Amino acid sequence: SFLTEFDDALFEAVGDAESSLCDLSREHSMVVVGSSIEAEGDHVYNTARVYQRGELIASYRKIHLFSPNVEHRHHEAGDQPCIVDTEVGRLGVLICYDIRFPELPRHCFYEGAEILVVPGQWPEARSQHWRTLLRARAIENELFVIGCNRTGQEASLRTGEAASFPGDGRIIDPTGEILATGNGDAGAVTALIELRKVRTMRRILPVASDLRPDIYRDLLRRVHDKVDAGTRDKQARSSLDERT
């Protein structure tokens, strides 16, 4: 059971944090997105929730689990993208490692997302990747990207060594311009965004109309076949190792 990895005190703290986000969205008439662990049955998910004026309006379970830090041993992967209409625009929601997989942000683009929100726990050692990937996703999908990263230190689940987290929250517009960044401390990063810039960029550079799904369909099928073959080979080797 995944739940043996976590204690009751942790889930109580998570519940308090979620209540705080809900209250914050109500008190300030805001849309708030935050991520934490979620228990359902015998499974634990890394889940982002979207609150609007004190109401939970959407949730997203992280699809891409971070295997280098053995996240897949402690959490179950989600299987449903999240795109939701809010008072501030149509949001696509990702979590941390998801940003490395362009297929998911592109799905949000297909579904008309205007803003991509990415809560993360991205370490200082790879902070350049965080900054570059957020900006790339904004440019290639012609939308705003809001990345929120943690600060402080925490031990790696895999090695036990402490990792530092730089904060480095940022707001990026559809042209790739960085509108605001954090300073490394816990706090708020703010910027005024104009959604008409999304429509303008998509008119000037009509990526949607120039897509070639007829080509991608076959390419994705080949990728799927290779991944399936690799998984079968890995399972076969594991079974052989167990017998020997």
Language model features: what each stretch is:
Residues 34-36, 47-50, 82, 169-171, ...:
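Short beta-strand scaffold segments in enzyme catalytic cores
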Residues 9, 59, 181:
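Conserved beta-strand positions that form and line the central face of beta-propeller blades
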Residues 1-10:
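Short, conserved active-site loops that position catalytic residues or coordinate cofactors/metal ions
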Residues 12, 23, 39-111, 119-120, ...:
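Active-site catalytic loop in hydrolytic enzyme cores
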Residues 38, 65-66, 152, 197:
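Active-site/binding-pocket entry motifs
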Residues 150-244:
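C-terminal beta-strand edge segments of enzyme domains
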Residues 18, 32, 85-89, 111, ...:
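RNA-binding accessory domains that recognize and position tRNA/RNA substrates
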Residues 14-33, 99-189:
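CN hydrolase (nitrilase-like) catalytic-core segments centered on the catalytic cysteine
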